[in-house]
């Protein structure tokens, strides 16, 4: 049975069964390149937030950068010198490029810029600042006092034994700066301090405010309570039986006296044949990199069109164009107020768009053709865009699309999507039949007589050649000095591509031909129609 209500609206309806204010939260650890797999979490949260607002809910949307998490290991993209920083909060690890305040900002800055380009504008929290500001102090105190109760919950839900020396709080060593090698030896609730001993040999006392952090399975429910989170998307790994959401539900209720947020569990985005994306394994296409290739609204559409619980197969090469085509067809139906467009499709389109981002009208595939015809020259591109019937008023948006296409051609385009316009009649024209050459001469005459022709008209004209009695068929017959010839349009398209590109195939013919000035086509086709290798020599 086809869906009639978008998943974001279903979530909003469920959430609104609980009255009051709503806080949609999302959080990602900026430990490496934040990839489009991570993007699913933020776009999902944004869609739920917008659906709540559309229903008049009192709602906020926040993003928490978990930059107080430790550096887990020396990732493949790091030099071995980072071994000494393993175990330190990533907000206190040096920036890999030396230009950002710290390691976490190196990955966070491009991610936040990518969110802006996607039209996503949450309130941004940084975990290290939250801890230092004392936002977690009461939660830390409660966790330390109720350590045994939390341990019991963890054992009952996860089925794993909690070590006797386990503590819900990881102090940061004053000597080595690590939070993964310390053990709590005592705490003072009144002074709000924690005593510890570290594997480096140092022991000391740290304040609860900024002197360390709660372990993940306690930090998450503590955050729900501290901030009042009511909705949160998260990956399926956290939703497994006995996983962090299951333990979090018990902890937030029994330890902190709050309700857990409405869960939106999402599946992974799979990168081609390489599997699920992961910053730590290097199977990744960063959001920033992808925004250099694809318009923002298409990336939003990739997430919005699919229910969170279904995995998404993503391939930035040729299959990407299928996604782009889908979105552009939706855009066209919406623009034309197509009666066949139902409310479900309209909702997908609405949630894929966002204010503050470019909405170019030119189809991506058509720009792939235009870019290569113009050899990347922006002024020529603008001329072709105008000649193709599109507005050139918003040059900024056109330039963004041009940049997307340029990068896609450079990084991902399969060989058959690439071409170059030959400056002279290609030698391959010698392989054309007499009928094909006659067609080129006749086509040149027809273009000259008609003047300006649209892409669609070019396409229809070529196909008209097979119709006996059509103007083009008659002109071909005159060139060959025969009665109405039998014509296969496939041979004619081959002649067009061969005469311009020196190859037997190319982009969609209508778009392709309308990208050229008529004089170029007339001259090229006439030259090709009389071409012979001897003549060229």
UniProtKB/Swiss-Prot annotation:
Q: Which PROSITE patterns match?
A: AA_TRNA_LIGASE_I
Protein location:
Cytoplasm
Under catalytic activity, the entry for this protein gives: tRNA(Lys) + L-lysine + ATP = L-lysyl-tRNA(Lys) + AMP + diphosphate
Q: What is this protein called?
A: Lysine--tRNA ligase 1
Q: Name one GO biological process term.
A: lysyl-tRNA aminoacylation
Q: Taxonomy-wise, where does this protein's organism fall, top ranks first?
A: Archaea, Methanobacteriati, Methanobacteriota, Stenosarchaea group, Methanomicrobia
Organism superkingdom: Archaea
Its EC number is: 6.1.1.6
Q: Does the keyword Nucleus apply?
A: no
> Listed GO molecular functions?
ATP binding; lysine-tRNA ligase activity; tRNA binding
**Gene Ontology cellular component annotations, sorted alphabetically:** cytoplasm
């Amino acid at each position: 049975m086809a869906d009639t209500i978008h998943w974001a609206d279903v979530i909003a309806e469920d959430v609104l069964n609980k009255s009051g204010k709503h806080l949609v939260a999302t959080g990602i650890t900026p430990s490496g390149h934040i990839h489009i797999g991570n993007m699913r979490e933020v776009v999902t949260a944004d869609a739920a937030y917008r659906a709540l607002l559309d229903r008049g809910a009192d709602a906020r949307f926040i993003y928490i950068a978990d930059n107080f998490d430790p550096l887990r290991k020396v990732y493949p993209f790091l030099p071995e010198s980072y071994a000494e920083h393993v175990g330190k909060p990533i907000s206190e690890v040096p920036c890999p490029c030396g230009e950002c305040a710290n390691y976490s900002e190196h990955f966070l800055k491009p991610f936040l810029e990518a969110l802006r380009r996607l039209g996503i504008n949450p309130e941004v929290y940084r975990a290290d600042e939250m801890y230092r500001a004392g936002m977690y102090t009461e939660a830390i105190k409660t966790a330390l006092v109720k350590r045994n109760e939390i341990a019991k919950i963890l054992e009952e839900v996860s089925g794993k034994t909690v070590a006797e020396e386990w503590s819900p709080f990881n102090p940061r060593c004053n000597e080595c700066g690590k939070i993964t090698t310390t053990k709590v030896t005592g705490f003072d609730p009144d002074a709000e301090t924690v005593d510890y001993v570290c594997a480096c040999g140092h022991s000391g006392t740290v304040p609860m405010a900024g002197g360390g952090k709660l372990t993940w399975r306690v930090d998450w429910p503590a955050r729900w309570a501290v901030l009042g989170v009511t909705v949160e998307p998260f990956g399926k790994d956290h939703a497994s039986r006995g996983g962090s959401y299951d333990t979090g539900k018990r902890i937030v209720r029994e330890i902190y006296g709050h309700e857990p947020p409405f869960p939106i569990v999402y599946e992974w985005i799979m990168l081609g044949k390489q599997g699920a994306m992961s910053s730590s394994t290097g199977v990744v296409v960063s959001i920033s990199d992808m925004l250099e290739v694809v318009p923002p609204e298409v990336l939003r559409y990739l997430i919005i069109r699919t229910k969170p619980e279904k995995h998404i197969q993503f391939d930035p090469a040729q299959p990407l164009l299928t996604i782009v085509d889908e979105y552009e067809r939706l855009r066209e139906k919406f623009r034309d107020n197509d009666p066949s467009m139902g409310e479900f499709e309209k909702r997908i389109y609405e949630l894929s768009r966002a204010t503050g981002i470019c909405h170019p009208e030119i189809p991506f595939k058509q720009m792939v053709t235009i870019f290569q015809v113009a050899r990347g020259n922006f002024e020529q591109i603008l001329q072709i865009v105008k000649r193709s019937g599109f507005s050139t008023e918003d040059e900024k948006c056109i330039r963004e699309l041009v940049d997307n296409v340029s990068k896609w051609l450079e990084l991902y385009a399969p060989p058959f999507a690439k071409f170059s316009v030959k400056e002279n009649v290609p030698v391959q024209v010698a392989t054309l039949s007499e009928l094909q050459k006659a067609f080129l001469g006749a086509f040149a005459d027809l273009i000259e007589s008609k003047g300006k022709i649209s892409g669609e008209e070019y396409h229809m004209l070529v196909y008209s050649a097979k119709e006996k009695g059509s103007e083009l068929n008659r002109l071909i017959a005159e060139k060959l000095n025969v009665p109405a010839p039998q014509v296969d349009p496939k041979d004619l398209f081959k002649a067009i591509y061969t005469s311009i590109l020196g190859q037997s195939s190319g982009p969609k013919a209508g778009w392709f031909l309308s990208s050229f000035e008529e004089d170029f086509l007339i001259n090229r086709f006439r030259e090709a129609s009389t071409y012979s290798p001897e003549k060229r020599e």
